[in-house]
Amino acid sequence: MSIPSLAEALATADTLFDRPTVEAQFVRMGKEIDQALDGERPVFLTVMHGALVFAAQLALAISTDLEFDYVHATRYRGGTTGHELHWLREPAVPLEGRIVLLVDDILDEGHTLKAVRDACLRMGAKRVLVAVMCTKLHGRRAEGIQADFNGVDVPDRYVFGYGMDLNEQARNLPAIYALAD
């Protein structure tokens, strides 16, 4: 798949979810997360860079106190398909005996999220909850990974905006778009 320029992509892309629709999901998810945490302070672990926009807004919708940290692991490296996992930063906060709320932009095939989740468990996390802004609907998910909290479902197309990139661009667009088929 060749990646169009941002201007070309926006001219033909479908707007899947506008800003108010996405933001309404943060409120719902925040309440669900508070209930699941039952007052226990988790490590709020953001997967960079894609989850940055989502994580910041989700954190504001959660009433439970959070300890912030981030990881940087990627499979995409500027492309539209993933390959080998590359670790750029592991958690700095000790995870031993803690609940980890792992926050990412999208659950696609799930290889990155699964690897990060499994690493958190190896580091001693007693429980890892996964929160994603969107889940891509298809049958290629890695075995054993799912979101505990999901904002919206997206079709099996290349999506961008609201933190998700199009060739390292468009992360700050205030809506979720899908490239034209």
Predicted regions and their residues:
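PRPP-associated nucleotide enzymes
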Residues: M1-D181
